[in-house]
Amino acid sequence: MDRSHIEQIAALERECFSTPWSEAMLTEALFDSQASFIVAESEEGGVLGYAGLQVVLDEGYIDNIAVEPNARRHGVADELLDVFCRFGEANLAFLTLEVRASNAPAIALYRKHGFEEAGRRKNYYTKPAEDAVIMTRYFKRIGNEHG
């Protein structure tokens, strides 16, 4: 992700999430040394989807995965998640994320990539209030008893 993507990603955030990241938040994230963002683009250069990852030591937290409604069911989210999982396999003990309990397609995608439910956060989401399912994927690394 670079500055040229910010406006389109902010629009995608507004379309996909009830509490979206603003252009200012996305711009600030560009300069966060612990954050990495990847973008899937169409042949014309439009943003089809994006994903964000925060890394602290050997722990990864997937902040966001969003895909344009017209691009869904075409493997965009699958590819974005695959990039972070390959990074995790090489560099992390685990990846974790939260997902709305009602978001069955996303939960199925995460399970396909080896994530398992690790817990729930009651009323984590607003607009509407809903529980978050915490999902984690552990990687086989020396000293990682979960992998």
PLM segments and residue spans:
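Conserved phosphate-binding and hydrolysis motifs of nucleotide-dependent enzymes
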Residues: 2, 49, 75-77, 103, ...
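Acetyl-CoA-dependent GNAT
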Residues: 3-70, 78-87, 138-146
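Short aromatic/hydrophobic contact patches that present stacked aromatics
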Residues: 64-66, 96-98, 134-136
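Residue-level recognition of the GNAT/N-acetyltransferase active site
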Residues: 68, 72, 98-102, 127
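Short glycine/proline-centered loop/turn elements that form peptide/ligand docking sites
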Residues: 77, 81, 102-106, 123-128
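Conserved GNAT acetyl-CoA-binding A-motif
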Residues: 88-98
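Conserved catalytic-core motifs of GNAT/GCN5-like acyltransferases
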Residues: 96-98, 116-132
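Conserved active-site tyrosine of GNAT-family acetyltransferases
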Residues: 110, 115, 135
